[in-house]
Amino acid sequence: ADSLRKDSLESNSQNYLKRIEGMTYGDSQVAGILRKNGFYHKDLDIRLISPDNWEVLNTPNSLIFIAPEGKASLQVSVSDQVRKETPKNYLSRLTSGEVYQSKELKLGGHQAFLTLLEENFRISRVAIVFKNKRIFTFYGTTEKNGLDIGEFDNQFLSIIESFRDLKATEIELTEPLLIKSYKVARGDSYSSLARKSPIPFDPESRLRLLNGDYPDGDLEVDAWIKIVE
């Protein structure tokens, strides 16, 4: 009876894996795709890179980069450009705060303005980028209202300065991640599979969750599991 029950469970598991084979994992191409620490958006034609160990949330209205323990965050939003002006002029219309350490520059070949902004007792790292009649606004601050912004500004700048058009070789990275069946080989572990996985932010935990092995379940050789490609 135990043998029959085990065979039945294995059969049900394999049927389930067949049904979910090829299902989308995470975001759609329309929303943009997160792979490892990269964000790729086909329609907007942009790529951004997150600092190591930062989480990235892709919401309907913005992309949010979050530092460990939520101590800082940088939000990226997009709007249509309706006036003929510079990024600096655009920001000056939006805020009456004080800007300093400012500069006009090119980011990924596009007109941009980079500054620190002090407004309503909060210090923020702000960048405005004009690209193809769209305005990309980067707004970074900290849990302490920017009083400790120096601790995170290098990471804010690394995100902002990673902004550029997609390369031809990156177009395939805008395709959504898919769930695939995988037969566990000798020597496999969740740790080794996570190193090869495109899942962004803590792929080992997410693979464990996907397979019901969170937090510390082990893999069995020849077992079929779900991975993401």
Model segments located where?
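Pan-zinc metallopeptidase signature
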Residues: 1-45, 169-173
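Short, hydrophobic/aromatic-rich segments at coil-to-beta transitions
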Residues: 33-39, 62-63, 107-116
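Secretory pathway targeting signatures of secreted, lumenal, and periplasmic proteins
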Residues: 47-93, 117-121
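Surface-exposed amphipathic alpha-helical segments
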Residues: 54, 140-178
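Short, well-ordered beta-strand elements
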Residues: 75-78, 134-146
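Signature of long, low-cysteine stretches enriched in small and polar/charged residues
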Residues: 92-137
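Primarily a LysM-type cell-wall glycan-binding module
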Residues: 170-201, 223
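Extracellular LysM carbohydrate-binding repeats and other cell-envelope/extracellular binding modules
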Residues: 201-229
